[in-house]
Amino acid sequence: VGAGSAGCVLANRLSADPDVSVCLIEAGGKDKSLMIRMPAGVGGLIKDAGPHNWGFYTDAQKHMNNRKLWWPRGKGWGGSSSINGMVYIRGHARDYDQWRQSGLRGWGYADVLPYFRRSEGYRGKADMHHGSDGPLVVEDSPLDSIAYDSFIKSGQEAGFPYTPDFNGADQEGVGPYQRTINDGERWSTARAFLHPVLKDRPNLTVMST
């Protein structure tokens, strides 16, 4: 696999066993660019195809006047977690439960929640929905923008319920989001799961351009 969003996590977990040799083969380069580390760089990263963005287009969409849609995808260490908007939001609990009801044992919300908590280093108050000791730093987005606050209030006035935590007990409604930013820098899966273990695990190798 490559060193994308999932590949970095997979490599971390597999290489924890010193008897296993793991090699990530990544088509892109290392995540050294300031534009990747700087959260404000997202606009430039997703705008055009380049060294960090594959720049895909979808197939023509019949119900969108046969338009092809721009589909930026990360290229390099961290994959799309190195170019995305850094919003941290999990799948809806009901979706996981529907998977379980369809016969996918072990994939109900109660089954996957412990793994979400294990991976998460939440900077807010840890509870049954959030973990505080994991490598993926998650923080609440500060309500320091007039536009941000007004958008939430407008949603409430339109009849949507307020939810303070989209990854908590109530996942439907309008409210502040959480983000993967650590001390002012983007916290991709490469920063969280790959970089911290590379020096100490001789059984883990990354091949990239």
Please state what every model-predicted region is.
Residues 1-209:
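N-terminal redox-cofactor-binding region of secreted/periplasmic oxidoreductases
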